[in-house]
Amino acid sequence: MEKNKKMIMQTEENTKISELLKKQIAQSEYPVVGAKFNNEYKNLDYSLEESGKIELIDINSKEGMKIYRRTLTFIMGMAFWRAYPKAHIVVDYQLSNAMYCTIENMEVTEEMMQKVKAKMQEIIDKDMKIEKRTMTRKEAEEFYKKTNTPKGRLQFDLEDNNEINMYYCGNYYNYFYEVVATHTGVTNIFDIQKYGNGFLLRYSSSKNVNILPKFKETKKLLW
């Protein structure tokens, strides 16, 4: 598939992007993690309701790497939930090809990092389905009251959006405002390591998606 090729598509109502462009996605040189439809970024499971311009987004692009990073963060949360279900994780800020995270109620140890990394690799190797479910704010408020869960609550409280996107994988779920990939297997290049009082969730660069770059000390960045 030609890099970043834009296509004008005509489709039947409620056709998923992943179904419409199945061949192009399979033939892509790099894993496809989302799409840009009529200038809006969409999940590959997004159901098209009209014809329009569509561009597949792979991980060899800045926006694709953002989706990669969000998906990896989701998987990291799922791995902690399986290994340390009581851990209160905070994603603090972005460094050079890494997210700096802390745990409010537990000490970060090397043993913990090894265990969580193994859980993450297991989730990635299984290429598990990640499903997006959109709720109204009222439905989301009722959901949080019913489940009494802290997952995604901070971000939820800070947003003013009328619609809330919850992402599910198996029995795990969390809230993300922007696009997350539809499968865990696209995030196969990563590392997690103890750093200061917290830890780093490291990932590749869109400049070279096949290697994990050496970590460099930098000022924190917005993510």
Features from the language model and the residues they span:
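Short, contiguous acidic and Ser/Thr-rich linear segments
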Residues: 4-16
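Short amphipathic alpha-helical segments
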Residues: 13-17, 68-72, 108-116
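Short amphipathic, charge-patterned alpha-helical segments
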Residues: 13-27
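Active/ligand-binding-proximal structured segments within catalytic/core domains
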Residues: 21-24, 65-83
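Short loop-to-beta-strand transition segments
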Residues: 27-38
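Auxiliary tRNA-acceptor-end handling modules of aminoacyl-tRNA synthetases
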Residues: 34, 46-65, 79, 88-96, ...
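Short alpha-helix capping/helix-loop boundary micro-motifs
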Residues: 38-44
